[in-house]
Each structure stands twice: as structure tokens, then as C-alpha cells.
């Protein structure tokens, strides 16, 4: 078990080093990853639930001689040797992210009035507080089952009218509406990178749906056995009588399945004919349960995993 903990602490720090992300001891423990092979499968000996406590992880970080060959620490953050600069970079990105959070909250306060919206969560770089000056702002939006196309259109129109929608070359501080799911909480992409993305989600509207999202996606713990949805992830934006009333009126007005079918057929056709949907290595999901648009997906999840494997292999070979 001790060798497993050593291997998985190292793997965790290497994985996040690829993303230029130094980690606190608590983060190393919470996001501790399992051993994986080249196909993103699991080490057969690591499939059982391991009892790796925060105290054990902290002890290994501070005292394990094997780990000390590879890692260093500064100001409470751990990282690979020679990467001290990541700490200052993370602190700077934290400041940038805090400023961008205000933009997201401003938009989300309006989106909560849109019919069928059930949850709004911050995703991507902003969720990890690693946004850069020119970063866009990713949201995951959950909508009532059976109304994903109606709700997506309404949200897109509203965010565009607010002048905050990302489109064309307008990227910085713009809302990227690239992921919608229904309250069935079906997630198609289930890999190491996706587990990272969903671990860091930050709900800003409707915490009840967020908890149900994690309960419906316990596959995340196959990659992150210590991760669990914590009570400190509370919604920042509360529902109000007015927002509930407007949603209720809108949902009654738009309740016809014919509207959803027409909008669904139109949007599916538009998505299919979009040149970005044909991008090699992209991941485009267009179903009644999930709408996801990642034309550059190959350079995200798969690329991160390949760099992670190569870096981990090089470290192990260098110290043999």
C-alpha cells in the first residue's frame, strides 16, 4: 500500500504539473489519482478503495525520501523540482480569476430567470482559479430533461444580448456556452481529464442539482478515489420568488413538445453543418441529454494525458 501511495502522489503532482498547477497538501489528497495504463485503464491492484488519509498523504509529502527526489515545496504548495515559478504564477492567476468571477456572477444572475435552467456551474480554468488575462469563461448549465434545445437557444440569446457571449474573435471575458446537460446528468466523456474538470466544478446557482449531478456521476471516483462533493461548494446566487415566477410562466408558455422538436431538429442540423464539427480530434455531442462542443478536445484531455505519461516515464527512467 505504501508503494501505491508514493506512486499515486507522484502521478498526481506530475499530472497537474502538465497543467502548470502546484498543489496544496489538501489538494494532493482530495484529487489523488489512481495508477493508469496507456489506455487510461486502471492498475488492477489499485481497483479496491484505498484508505489514504490526509495525514498519510501529508506525511509522505514531508518525509518520503523517494518522493523528495522528484518534488519540492514553497509557501505551502508542492510541485516537481525545478518548477518553483509555478507558485507565483498560480497566485497571480488566482487574482485574475477573482476579477473574472464577478463577470460570471453578473451573467448568471440573469440566466437564472431563463425557463428550464436548473443549475449553473463554473468550469474550466476559472473553476481552478487558473484563468489568464485573455481567458474566456466556461459554464456548465443543467436544464430540465426534455428541454435542452429550447433552453440552450434562450440562454444563448440572453447572453448575446448582454454582450457577454463568446463568438468569432471575441474571447476575453466572454461566456463560453459549450456544455449543456439535462437533469438526468448524463456525461459522455469519462476519462482522466474529464474527472479533473468535474472535480473542480463550482456551482453558482442551485446546489441541490449539483449534488445530484455528483451522485449520478460516481465514476469520477474511479479516477479520484478521495474525491467527494463537499458541503462548502454552496451556490452563491440564490433563487428568488421573481426568478421562480418568471421561469414558471416561461415554462408554461413553452411547454409544447413540438417547440422542442422543431428547435432540436434545427440546432442538430446547424451543428452538423458547422465546419468546426468536422475538426479532426474534436468532440461534439448533440443529443437530447447533452450538448457539448469541444472542437479542440484532442489538445485538451488526450494531449494532457500523453504529456503526463511521458513526463512520468521520464522521471522514473531518470532515477532508475
Residue ranges: model-predicted function:
Residues 2-134, 143-320:
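Catalytic core of pol beta-like nucleotidyltransferases
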Amino acid at each position: 500500500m505504501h508503494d501505491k501511495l508514493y506512486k499515486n502522489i507522484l502521478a498526481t503532482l506530475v499530472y497537474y504539473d502538465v497543467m502548470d498547477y502546484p498543489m496544496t497538501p489538501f489538494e494532493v489528497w482530495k484529487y489523488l489519482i489512481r495508477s493508469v495504463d496507456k489506455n487510461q485503464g486502471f492498475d488492477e491492484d489499485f481497483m479496491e478503495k484505498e484508505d489514504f488519509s490526509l495525514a498519510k498523504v501529508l506525511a509522505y509529502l514531508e518525509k518520503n525520501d523517494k518522493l523528495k527526489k522528484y518534488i519540492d515545496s514553497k509557501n505551502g504548495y508542492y510541485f516537481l523540482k525545478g518548477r518553483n515559478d509555478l507558485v507565483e504564477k498560480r497566485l497571480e492567476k488566482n487574482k485574475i480569476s477573482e476579477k473574472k468571477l464577478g463577470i460570471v456572477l453578473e451573467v448568471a444572475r440573469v440566466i437564472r430567470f431563463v425557463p428550464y435552467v436548473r443549475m449553473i456551474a463554473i468550469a474550466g480554468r476559472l473553476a481552478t482559479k487558473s484563468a489568464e488575462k485573455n481567458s474566456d469563461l466556461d459554464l456548465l448549465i443543467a436544464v430540465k430533461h426534455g428541454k435542452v434545445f429550447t433552453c440552450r437557444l434562450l440562454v444563448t440569446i440572453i447572453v448575446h444580448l448582454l454582450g457577454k457571449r463568446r463568438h468569432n474573435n471575441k474571447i476575453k471575458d466572454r461566456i463560453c456556452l459549450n456544455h449543456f446537460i439535462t437533469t438526468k446528468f448524463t456525461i459522455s466523456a469519462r476519462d482522466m481529464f474529464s474527472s479533473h474538470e468535474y472535480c473542480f466544478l463550482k456551482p453558482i446557482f442551485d446546489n441541490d442539482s449539483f449534488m445530484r449531478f455528483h451522485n449520478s456521476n460516481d465514476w469520477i471516483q474511479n479516477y479520484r478515489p478521495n474525491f467527494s462533493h463537499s458541503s462548502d461548494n454552496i451556490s452563491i446566487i440564490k433563487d428568488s420568488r421573481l426568478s421562480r415566477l418568471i421561469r414558471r410562466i416561461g415554462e408554461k408558455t413553452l411547454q409544447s413538445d413540438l417547440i422542442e422538436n422543431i428547435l432540436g431538429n434545427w440546432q442538430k442540423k446547424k451543428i452538423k453543418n458547422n465546419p468546426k464539427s468536422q475538426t479532426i480530434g474534436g468532440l461534439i455531442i448533440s443529443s437530447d441529454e447533452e450538448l457539448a462542443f469541444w472542437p479542440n478536445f484532442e489538445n485538451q484531455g488526450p494531449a494532457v494525458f500523453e504529456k503526463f505519461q511521458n513526463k512520468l516515464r521520464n522521471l522514473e527512467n531518470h532515477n532508475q
